[in-house]
Amino acid sequence: MENQIKIRTKQIGLEVIKLLDELPQKMSAWVISKQIMRCSTSIGSNYRAACRAKSEADFLNKLRIVEEESDETSYWLEILEEAYLIKPIRIEKLKKEVNEITAIIVASQKTVQKKVHFK
């Protein structure tokens, strides 16, 4: 499962990169694109870092970062949609994937926290 999540989190960043190339050449789109590029690509890079964590506490901390970046990505996708910078149909699948990854990461955190608590 770990490898699947690595692939999925990396794919989110790649899909956002493709999406940003479709945005109009407007100042607002440019500013938002910088924000969403950073957080969406950070999902995959921080998940990879979590997989190399030295301890369960380190793993949990890195997963929290993944959760934050995933949530921020979701926020910026909503902004793109609500500001009419991209058609909703174009980001529907991406929003769903980001939400699924967020749910998986939150569930993983809860599992590790229980494991740590029972030690």
Model region roles, listed by residue range:
Residues 1-119:
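Short, C-terminally biased terminal segments at protein or domain edges
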